[in-house]
């Protein structure tokens, strides 16, 4: 009887140690396709996490809305359906109007301006996300508002 008790203690210890030794895998929901620079940054972030954690945490990216569509990512992470997600912040304005601050026309017209705006708004954004049970990890600037064309536009006539 003592032997069985001893054996069960060893088995429980083994099971517990196996669970702590197993690397953890997180699925990261991404709205944009793999070729988009936001997805490329998320993939690099995931790679860095795996390397820096010594493989204890692996983040698998799911670009193009393959895990959750863009509009579903915020809720999916909040409810634990996805461990991590990346989303264009201003698309979350219904969750918190402050998240739209960087998309106000002409407020930040360059990457330098975007960095200043980010630094000025980050603390409140972090606080707002924290109140929703989320952790702000990083930000990637989106190109400033502009006119996109296949040909160069130098005058009104070019339009």
List the predicted regions and their residue ranges.
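Bacterial N-terminal signal peptides
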Residues: 7-17
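Sec/Tat signal peptide C-region and signal peptidase I cleavage site
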Residues: 17-23
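Extracytoplasmic "Venus flytrap"
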Residues: 27-44, 64-68
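Short, polar/charged alpha-helical segment
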Residues: 35-60, 124
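Contiguous mixed-secondary-structure segments that line small-molecule binding/active-site clefts
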Residues: 46-47, 83, 88-158
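A local structural motif
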Residues: 48-66, 134-135, 157-158
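Alpha-to-beta junction loops
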Residues: 54-57, 73-87
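Short helix-initiation/N-cap motifs at beta->coil->alpha
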Residues: 62-75, 154
């Amino acid at each position: 009887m003592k032997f069985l008790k001893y054996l069960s203690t060893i088995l429980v210890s083994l099971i517990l140690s196996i669970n702590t030794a197993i690397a953890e895998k997180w699925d990261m929901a991404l709205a944009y396709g793999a070729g988009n620079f936001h997805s490329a940054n998320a993939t690099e972030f995931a790679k860095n996490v795996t390397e820096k954690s010594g493989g204890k945490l692996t983040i698998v990216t799911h670009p193009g809305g393959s895990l959750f569509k863009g509009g579903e990512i915020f809720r999916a992470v909040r409810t634990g359906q996805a461990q991590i997600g990346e989303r264009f912040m201003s698309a979350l304005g219904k969750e918190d109007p402050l998240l739209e601050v960087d998309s106000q026309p002409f407020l930040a017209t360059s990457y330098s301006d975007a960095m200043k705006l980010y630094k000025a708004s980050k603390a409140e954004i972090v606080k707002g996300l924290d109140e929703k049970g989320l952790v702000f990890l990083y930000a990637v600037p989106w190109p400033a508002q502009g006119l996109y064309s296949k040909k160069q536009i130098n005058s009104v006539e070019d339009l």
